[in-house]
Amino acid sequence: ASEALVEIKPGEIGMVSGIPDEHLRRFVVI
């Protein structure tokens, strides 16, 4: 799941996962 989230763009992940962009950015950065 982590790899799939990293591959998807932050904006798309927000809509799919429903998590705020800030949290998504932190995940991608890490």
From Swiss-Prot:
Entry's localization field: Mitochondrion inner membrane
Disulfide bonds: none
UniProt EC number: 7.1.1.2
Enzyme class, UniProt record, top EC level: translocase
GO MF term list: NADH dehydrogenase (ubiquinone) activity
Catalytic activity: a ubiquinone + NADH + 5 H(+)(in) = a ubiquinol + NAD(+) + 4 H(+)(out)
Subunit field text: Complex I is composed of about 45 different subunits.
Protein name: NADH-ubiquinone oxidoreductase 18 kDa subunit
